[in-house]
């Protein structure tokens, strides 16, 4: 599918960036590292994100001086056509753990529809190469005392591609990452990100 993606976008005015390693988190890290603009946005190519929400997100960053804006499928007047019962329950549990362990005030920890200040994202020293990136990013952002907010978002049914998340395998990786970060920054007391 990588070749199909490259073929589909090669006629557009965009840079194609190749990963050094493999994995969802590695792709997002590599993307953030190469951004040269003031703001960046993680935006899935499967058609599930609503581009109409981008203007609202950028206005939150510029006018309200937030460092990051997280979209959420679990605010009022929003939802998802792509969520399953298992992913909904898993996300609820991980979001709850984010609140308990780190006082993280977002309602959809696994939804990586995020816009933010590039300079702030580059300070986070992100390391996850897999789907645990979804929790590492907001947790390190919170631990770094950056200013953030959530907005309501509606996730549409994907237009193309297959869901690559394995709810149980990736759920275990995500839980392991949360425990690791909790032990490192809250129990052992390493304050440096």
Positions of predicted regions on the chain:
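Short, structured coil segments at secondary-structure junctions
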Residues: 12-13
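Acceptor/aglycone-binding surface of glycosyltransferases and processive sugar-polymer synthases
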Residues: 19-34, 39-42, 51-131, 157-175
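A conserved acidic beta->alpha catalytic loop
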Residues: 1-6, 47
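Catalytic donor-sugar/metal-binding loop of nucleotide-sugar-dependent glycosyltransferases
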Residues: 104-105, 126-129, 138-156
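Terminal low-complexity segments of carbohydrate-biosynthetic enzymes
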Residues: 173-193
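Hydrophobic packing residues within well-ordered alpha-helices of enzyme cores
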Residues: 5-9, 57
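Hydrophobic residues within well-ordered alpha-helices
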Residues: 9, 61, 141-143
């Amino acid at each position: 599918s990588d070749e199909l993606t490259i073929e589909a976008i090669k006629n557009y005015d965009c840079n194609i960036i190749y990963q050094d390693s493999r994995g969802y988190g590695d792709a997002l890290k590599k993307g953030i590292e190469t951004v040269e603009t003031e703001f960046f946005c993680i935006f899935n190519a499967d058609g599930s994100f609503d581009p109409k929400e981008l203007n609202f997100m950028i206005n939150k960053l510029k006018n309200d001086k937030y460092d990051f804006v997280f979209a959420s499928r679990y605010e009022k007047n929003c939802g998802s056509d792509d969520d399953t019962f298992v992913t909904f329950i898993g996300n609820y549990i991980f979001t709850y753990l984010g609140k308990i362990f780190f006082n993280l005030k977002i309602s959809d920890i696994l939804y990586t529809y995020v816009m933010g200040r590039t300079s702030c994202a580059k300070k986070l020293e992100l390391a996850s190469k897999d789907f645990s990136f979804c929790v590492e990013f907001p947790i390190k952002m919170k631990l770094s005392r950056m200013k953030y907010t959530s907005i309501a978002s509606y996730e549409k049914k994907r237009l193309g591609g297959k869901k690559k998340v394995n709810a149980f395998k990736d759920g275990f990786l995500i839980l392991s990452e949360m425990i690791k970060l909790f032990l490192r920054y809250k129990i052992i007391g390493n304050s440096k990100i």
